[in-house]
Swiss-Prot record:
Gene Ontology molecular function terms on file: carboxylic ester hydrolase activity; lysophosphatidic acid acyltransferase activity
InterPro entries noted in UniProt: AB_hydrolase_1, AB_hydrolase_fold, Epox_hydrolase-like
EC number: 3.-.-.-
First-level EC class: hydrolase
Residues in AB hydrolase-1 domain copies: 168-270
Gene that encodes it: abhd8
Key word Transmembrane helix present: no
Biological process, per Gene Ontology: lipid homeostasis; phosphatidic acid biosynthetic process
Residue stretches in coiled coil: none
The protein's name: Protein ABHD8
């Protein structure tokens, strides 16, 4: 205890962080990890597991021949933005019909309606404008929209098995974590034959930690993830993100709609533009944050886990769920600025998305994930009663089963001729 206090006093005097993440000198493969230099001096550790038994090409070709025309979904919706910030989403196709969207897991329900009217939803609440219901329908139709976006495309969503050589799973962690939080998922899916990729964000795990705040902005981190994605991506890629990592999955799905086949968002929150809070404990000086680090770790344990027993403390420690220097933590929180990632940005996504929410999560309220389910086009929301923010550590078997069922899910083929006739 005295040693810990002394270390913090020395830190306040010298500004040097004990046990901080140091630079990685190699950019080669080591102990099953890749160290990739995405920019000069910016090296990320990546866990890349290749299947021990590559998929049978003949079996894949036979599967493709049998199911080549299946899983075709017509994604059609009109997104209207009004000048008072209100948003109206009309699903014009039959994409969200329950007979088309179904999973092997009977508990999964498709989220969405044929017409949704939504007010501006920001991190500060709904104060931006009046409610849509307060305006008479006749007057509402006469309003001149600020912007109208038409989404009209076809996607082929297929079953993704571990034996398929064109499938890669990407796992992206959030603030304070590392790729170690995915240990159970990486082991489970690699044993099923999937190729898996999990990076450490810069400043986290064994990646380098630049001592400049600009290195931790959303845009800098997003470009890192773009480099990782372009390095390992194949024909069908599935992105799995947790917390802040969900934002990077959303970014990649928007940037590469033809390469991102499915997305899983675990406790990612609502479809809101990112903006750092002005009144936050993370705006305090780094030395003060360092002195408060034991309190922050305890607060994370309380808010991130449904229980706070010995097992959870061990998971927190061994999973590196919250193990980052005070400088990196402060820079990460203040760098979360992404105005483009608003409701419209999310509404434009046509990729199938699974939302996973831990019922006891104190960081992300349930209504935020429900809001996300309303905005997205093809989505399922699954609530895990026993889990919290770190649900992949608390309930690994449940999460693994849920993810696997979603990977295997394939929608029934739509009758596009009948649908187009109905729309006319």
């Amino acid at each position: 205890m005295l040693t810990s206090i002394a270390e913090r006093i020395m830190y306040c005097l010298t500004g040097k962080t004990p046990n901080s993440v140091g630079p990685v000198e190699t950019s080669e493969t080591s102990d099953g990890y890749d160290f990739l230099e995405v920019k000069p001096g910016r090296v990320l550790r990546v866990r890349h597991i290749l299947p021990s038994c590559p998929g049978d090409r003949e079996e894949e070709e036979l599967f493709e021949e049998k199911n080549g025309g299946q899983g075709l979904v017509h994604c059609k919706r009109r997104i209207t933005v009004y000048r008072n910030g209100q948003l109206v989403i009309e699903n014009l196709g039959a994409t969200l019909r329950s007979e088309i969207l179904h999973c092997r897991n009977g508990n999964l329900e498709p989220a969405g309606t044929l017409e949704v009217e939504l007010s501006d939803f920001t991190s500060t609440g709904n104060e931006g404008g009046g409610k849509e219901s307060d305006v008479p329908p006749g007057k509402r139709r006469k309003r001149k929209p600020k912007k109208v976006i038409m989404v009209d495309c076809q996607r082929q969503v297929k079953c993704c098995k571990g034996t398929h050589s064109d499938v890669v799973l990407f796992f992206i962690h959030g603030v304070g974590g590392s790729l170690d939080i995915w240990k159970e998922q990486l082991d489970f899916f690699s044993k099923l034959g999937y190729e898996v990729v999990a990076p450490d964000l810069v400043g986290h795990g064994a990646s380098t930690a630049p001592q400049i705040g600009a290195a931790y902005t959303f845009y800098a981190l997003a470009e890192d993830m773009r480099c990782i994605f372009k390095r390992y991506a194949k024909k069908r890629n599935i992105l799995v993100g947790h917390s802040y990592g969900v934002s990077f999955c959303t970014f990649l799905a928007h940037e590469y709609p033809d390469l991102v086949h499915k997305v899983v968002m675990i406790n990612g929150g609502g479809p809101t533009a990112l903006e750092p809070s002005l009144c936050s404990i993370f705006n305090m000086p780094t030395c003060v944050l360092h002195c408060l680090s034991p309190c922050l770790a305890w607060s994370f344990l309380k808010a991130g886990f449904a229980r706070q027993g010995a097992k959870e403390k061990q998971l927190l420690r061994e999973g590196n769920a919250f193990n980052v220097s005070s400088f990196v933590l402060r820079a990460m929180m203040s760098g979360q600025y992404w105005p483009e990632g608003d409701e419209v940005y999310h509404a434009e996504l046509t990729v199938p998305i699974l939302l996973v929410h831990g019922m006891h999560d104190k960081f992300v309220p349930l209504d935020e994930d429900q809001r996300m389910a309303e905005i997205l086009l093809i989505t399922f929301l699954k609530i895990i009663e026993e889990g919290s923010h770190m649900v992949m550590l608390e309930c690994p078997e449940t999460v693994n089963t849920l993810l696997h069922e979603f990977f295997l899910w394939q929608p029934e083929t739509q009758n596009t001729t009948a649908e187009d006739t109905g729309n006319e």
